[in-house]
Amino acid sequence: MEKTEHKVLVANRGEIAVRIVQACRKLGLEFVCVHTAEDIHSGHVRIAKELGGEKSLYQVSSYHDANEILSVADDAGATAIHPGYGFFAEDFRFARRVTTRERKLIFIGPSWRVIRELGDKINTKRLARSLGVPTVPGSDRPIYDEMEAEKIAR
């Protein structure tokens, strides 16, 4: 079986991006990192430059711009996107777009369906209970009244 070479686009910043870059290096995977102008001297940019050189860095205007992130993925020849946490890690629409567009990429994380289903904490709690998984005490529905929230908290 032929080994597929992958290049991972790291779509995050800070410590999580540093860890993803280090993991890619350890696994022998190529990587590219995005960064904003404000983050040019941050840790993830320094380590990406150190381990991958200038070609591993792409400046973006925002970590939240899906179009720009996907454009960088295409320009860099990335085959996968690692969202880290926050930003796109919890956005099922982004994960779905990554994996269903014409130039499909691997989304490193849960499937978009899982993100969609478990992204709502109330639905997640209901699902856990239905499967017999213990949950913390509290409400199974949204609380809009401060007095009710205090009552449940006691």
Explain the meaning of each model-derived region.
Residues 1-154:
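N-terminal beta-alpha lobe that positions the nucleotide/phosphoryl donor
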